[in-house]
Amino acid sequence: MTVLLFGFEPFLEYKENPSQLIVEALNRSTILKEEVKGVILPVEYKKIEDVIVTKIRETKPILTLGIGLAPGRAKITPEKIAINYRYSREGDNAGKKYRGEKIDPLGQDGIFTNIPVEDLVDLLNENGIPAELSLSAGSYLCNNAMYIIIREARKYNSLGGFIHVPLHESYAARIQRSIPSMSLDTMIRGIKLSIEFILTNKNKKENLTLS
C-alpha cells in the first residue's frame, strides 16, 4: 500500500515552501512498511483538483495527507475540517482570485477529516513537537486541497487529511523577518510521527473489528 503526501510549491512572497521540502524529504521512504509517495502541487486553483484526483485514483493510497504552509502559525496544526468555499484576496500563482465560490457545487458545505487529529495533537506534544488543533484551514489553496483530498479519499474508503506547518527557521532567518518558525528537521520528524500514528491507529481499529 501507499501513503500519498501532497506539498505545495512556493507562493506569494515566500520563495521557499517548507511543505515542499518536507514532502521531498519523505518521498520514497518507507513508514511502517508503507511506501511514501510525494507530490508537489502547483499553487493554482485550476490545476490542483486534477492532480489530486488523478494521483489518488492511480495509487489508491491507504492514507492521503496534504501539507501546507501557514505563515504566522508557530506550531504544527492538524486540520479538523475543510469548507466548501474559496475566497482569496491574494491571487494564486496564475493570478486567479475567488470571491466566495464553492469548490464543489454539488458537495457538502464542510467535510471532517477521518484522521484522529485530537489524539494526533497530543502525540506530537508528548514527543516535544509543538502542535495545536486547528478548526480552520482558511479559504485559500490549502483548504481547497484539503476538501478535495477528503472527498476523494472517501470514495476509496481510505484516510484523508491536512496538516499546516510554520515557516522554516532557516528561511525566516534569511529574509530577516520576525515571524513564527520551526526547524525543518522538527517538522519532518513531526510529519513522520503523524504518519506512523495514523497508520498504527488504523491497524488497531481493524484488529478490534476482526476480533
Swiss-Prot record:
Reactions performed catalytically: Release of an N-terminal pyroglutamyl group from a polypeptide, the second amino acid generally not being Pro
Annotated EC: 3.4.19.3
GO-annotated molecular function: pyroglutamyl-peptidase activity
CDD domains per UniProt: Peptidase_C15
GO annotation (BP), single: proteolysis
Assembly notes: Homotetramer.
Role played: Removes 5-oxoproline from various penultimate amino acid residues except L-proline.
Family per record: Belongs to the peptidase C15 family.
Protein name: Pyrrolidone-carboxylate peptidase 1
Source species: Saccharolobus solfataricus (strain ATCC 35092 / DSM 1617 / JCM 11322 / P2)
Gene name of this polypeptide: pcp1
